[in-house]
Amino acid sequence: MSHNDTIVAQATPPGRGGVGILRISGLKARDVAQEVLGKLPKPRYADYLPFKDVDGSALDQGIALWFPGPNSFTGEDVLELQGHGGPVILDLLLKRILTLPGVRIARPGEFSERAFLNDKLDLAQAEAIADLIDASSEQAARSALNSLQGAFSARVNHLVEALTHLRIYVEAAIDFPDEEIDFLSDGKIEAQLNGVIADLDAVRTEARQGSLLREGMKVVIAGRPNAGKSSLLNALAGREAAIVTDIAGTTRDVLREHIHIDGMPLHIIDTAGLRDANDEVERIGIERAWQEIEQADRVLFMVDGTTTDAVDPADIWPDFIARLPKNLPITVVRNKADITGETLGISEVNGHSLVRLSARTGEGVDVLRNHLKQSMGFDTNMEGGFLARRRHLQALAEAANHLEQGKAQLLGAWAGELLAEELRLAQQSLSEITGEFTSDDLLGRIFSSFCIGK
């Protein structure tokens, strides 16, 4: 679809509401105002007017806001019509606007896409709009707003600028081959490079925090039937999310709960008890349990403390451990400490964390909460911050790798050309975050995940 088209979409959620907003952007927005309002409102002033149908009769009345480009969100002429929030009224008004030639329904995220293409915001800021809307906690919302206001982009642009200066220095050395070795070995370039690497490491640390705020951690509770998995889900969720009985196999499907631990989103998944099942429904539930385990960030291996004294997972259930994906973190949870009399707390056993608790009474559950927060490296004391997506983390990691490769070329062979190339690739990776170097395919995937009216 052409970016020369004028687009329209509802900017408020579907359904009934006190106010419903239609947003129009493009060259024909001026014509829409003349046809629907009978005049062009004063720029950036609220004008209370009737919204007219083709025959001149009123469809609704409300507030019209006119933002002539380039001083608008999209950088184009923008008209907003704020009427009553009934779906029938909004649908009639939308159909009226679509009768005008050159006007079409907007694609998801197309308003934000046009703002990006018209340099009203960069790609990281555009993504922050969607993240702010989807924020599931106060801390996530504040971090998304920081990104929208340019905090993340400013950090990235600072790194790009530092790399630009470093590249100039290195390439100047290459232009004078008789003095290149002296330029590269005098310590100045190494010091500057180390400074950029340190700054990048700091940004990566904050970005990982931002990714946790946005994505959360997926934790799967797994174990044999009647180990107390559903009781632990309820204890972590703080409500009776799962049915708990003494009957083995009560949980036959996957149960999901979304909670927060000091601002960090946590996706807790309770699964069917793992065993050789003859019942077809239970067997399907066990298959789904393994699917969730394979996609988990961490598995809570739930153990009934009344059935074994073992603490090493390989001793408790070797077949279960052997089937787990390689490098998947495991926390052994010895449950029913209120019955066994075990000392509550956390310890380490052969590289695995071991938590002793009682899911039924809630004793020791706070220890598990703190363990989950710490195991993901979440820092509740970090001020400010910004949200980050997986693609941001990947771009930062690629940039860090190129800088390390460049440092190896500098210190190992004084190879100026190879160092310059690694610096260029690092700069390109960072520029993908803000959209300075980004493929059209990636842009399409990013903006298609937005709301229609954004």
UniProtKB/Swiss-Prot annotation:
Pfam families: MMR_HSR1, MnmE_helical, TrmE_N
Single annotated GO MF: GTP binding
Co-factor remark: Binds 1 potassium ion per subunit.
Sites where the protein binds (6S)-5-formyl-5,6,7,8-tetrahydrofolate: R23, E80, K120, K454
Cofactor(s) required, per the database record: K(+)
Positions with a binding annotation for K(+): N226, T245, I247, T250
UniProt: GTP binding residues: 226-231, 245-251, 270-273, 335-338, 358-360
InterPro entries: G_TrmE (IPR031168), GTP-bd (IPR006073), GTP-bd_TrmE_N (IPR018948), GTPase_MnmE (IPR004520), MnmE_dom2 (IPR027368), MnmE_helical (IPR025867), P-loop_NTPase (IPR027417), Small_GTP-bd (IPR005225)
Swiss-Prot/TrEMBL keywords: Cytoplasm, GTP-binding, Hydrolase, Magnesium, Metal-binding, Nucleotide-binding, Potassium, tRNA processing
Family according to the record: Belongs to the TRAFAC class TrmE-Era-EngA-EngB-Septin-like GTPase superfamily. TrmE GTPase family.
Subunit structure: Homodimer. Heterotetramer of two MnmE and two MnmG subunits.
Function field: Exhibits a very high intrinsic GTPase hydrolysis rate. Involved in the addition of a carboxymethylaminomethyl (cmnm) group at the wobble position (U34) of certain tRNAs, forming tRNA-cmnm(5)s(2)U34.
PANTHER family in the cross-refs: TRNA MODIFICATION GTPASE GTPBP3, TRNA MODIFICATION GTPASE GTPBP3, MITOCHONDRIAL
HAMAP family: GTPase_MnmE
Name of the protein in question: tRNA modification GTPase MnmE
